[in-house]
């Protein structure tokens, strides 16, 4: 019910498919990123910039973003608010 979420540089994802937004600094997440690359499930949306957030989807795809996790989370929240406002207008 989140719709499309901007993850930076004109890239958008389906908010309903995201199950986690995490900071990429830990070793387990670096391994997860490497495994996804080997399996062909890594999507790099950083445009060569530093990875600041890793988004994990329900299909086990790993999406790299150059936007901070907090910023992406705020965009999810804003998207939900906009959807609720539109639903209230219809009711």
Swiss-Prot record:
Family to which the UniProt record says this protein belongs: Belongs to the RemA family.
What top-level branch of life does the organism fall under?
Bacteria
Q: What is the lineage of its organism?
A: Bacteria, Thermotogati, Thermotogota, Thermotogae, Thermotogales
Q: Which NCBIfam families match?
A: PRK04323.1 (NF003315)
Q: Name one Pfam family in it.
A: RemA-like
Designated name of the protein: Putative regulatory protein Tlet_1629
What is the protein's species of origin?
Pseudothermotoga lettingae (strain ATCC BAA-301 / DSM 14385 / NBRC 107922 / TMO)
Q: Which InterPro entries match?
A: RemA-like
């Amino acid at each position: 019910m989140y719709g499309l979420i901007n993850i930076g540089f004109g890239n958008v994802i389906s908010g309903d498919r995201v199950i986690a937004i995490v900071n990429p600094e830990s070793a387990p997440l670096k391994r997860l990123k490497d495994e996804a690359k080997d399996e062909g499930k890594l999507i790099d949306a950083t445009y060569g910039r530093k990875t600041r957030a890793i988004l994990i989807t329900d299909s086990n795809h790993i999406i790299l973003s150059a936007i901070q996790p907090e910023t992406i989370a705020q965009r999810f929240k804003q998207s939900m608010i906009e959807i609720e406002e539109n639903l209230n207008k219809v009711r």
